[in-house]
Each structure stands twice: as structure tokens, then as C-alpha cells.
Amino acid sequence: MTTPTFDTIEAQASYGIGLQVGQQLSESGLEGLLPEALVAGIADALEGKHPAVPVDVVHRALREIHERADAVRRQRFQAMAAEGVKYLEENAKKEGVNSTESGLQFRVINQGEGAIPARTDRVRVHYTGKLIDGTVFDSSVARGEPAEFPVNGVIPGWIEALTLMPVGSKWELTIPQELAYGERGAGASIPPFSTLVFEVELLEIL
């Protein structure tokens, strides 16, 4: 396959669309896709050609490759969910860790003396979020700017914690996947069924 040049608007836009499609497919979990065949399919569709592969064969192949991806995803995420449960069990034994009825765990790093937010309040916080392997996926501290949001506009584990924390407090939260993003995850940085660890400092009720 010859390498195209990208010296026209049309070529640059076409390449950009290809990048977007490729990124979506890369994140889909579908394995074994062949770029040459993918490009051929796009070209046939754009040029209005008769499909080179019978439609029923295409549908069968698509079904099979999706089933394979689903099986791999289930196996991977079941293991991740189990790791989260084990992490929570071990974390609950640590000194200073409190567990609520919902399964939320928190450790007080610093206890403030201010007001406690209601679900209807808007708050300003600093936070760092990690996966249980220590990978940081988001941090207002690293950005150097606190985050502001309504209490009832975040994940359930955060809502519960914020409505227990006095202003001025800094807590470490360990949030079961059921109180976080559950089976859907959140983009590429938070896989499905992830138990999450946050260090949260409640700065102000707005």
C-alpha cells in the first residue's frame, strides 16, 4: 500500500476521520482487525461498490469477533472486580479506616470543624484519584486548581462522603465499584468494575 500525501484539506480531513475511527476501534476491545481489509471496506462503501464479501458472511464474522471480545472483557473484568473486593477486605483491617453500611471506606487524615454539605449544596474540593494499583487517573492538585461541582452531581461514594465531611477535612476514600462507575467504567482511565481510592480535601461550601 502506497503512503498517501496529506497536502490538501480533503486528505487531511480524511486522515483525521481515519484516526477517529481507528481510535474508537482500538478502544472497543475488538482484536485481530486487519487495517488493509478495513480500508478496503471503507473504500468500497465510499465508491458505492458491491461488497467484496457477502453480507451474511460479514454479519457472521462481526458477531463472532464481538463474542470473542465480550468473553475476553468478562474474564478480565471479573478478575478486576475480585481484586477490588480483596483490596477492600484488606483495607478495612487497617488502623483508622471506617466502613459505612453502604461499603464506603474512609480514613480521616485531617478533621475539619466547618459545616457539613447537604446533597443540594455546591462545593469546592481538592482531590487525587487512583486505581488500587496506585495509578493516578485524575488530580485537581496536579492541575493546581480546585474543582467545583454540586454534591449530587458526582458518584454515589463521593456523595456519601461529602455529606459526612465537615469543611476543612481531608479524607482518604476507598470506594467500591458499586459506588463508583460500576460496569461501565469511565473512559480509558477507569476500567469497568474498578475500586477507586481518592484523597479528598473539602475546601468550601459555595
From Swiss-Prot:
Keywords, in A-Z order: Cytoplasm, Isomerase, Periplasm, Rotamase
Cell compartment(s), UniProt: Cytoplasm; Periplasm
InterPro entries linked to this entry: PPIase_dom_sf, PPIase_FKBP_dom, PPIase_FKBP_N, PPIase_FKBP_N_sf
Record has Protein biosynthesis as a keyword: no
Activation/inhibition comment: Strongly inhibited by FK506.
Main localization of the protein described in the UniProt heading: cytoplasm
Gene Ontology process terms (BP): chaperone-mediated protein folding
Entry's EC annotation: 5.2.1.8
A Pfam family this chain is assigned to: FKBP_N
Assembly mode: Homodimer.
UniProt cross-references to NCBIfam families, sorted A to Z: PRK11570.1
Name of the protein this chain belongs to: FKBP-type 22 kDa peptidyl-prolyl cis-trans isomerase
Lineage: Bacteria, Pseudomonadati, Pseudomonadota, Gammaproteobacteria, Enterobacterales
Gene: fklB
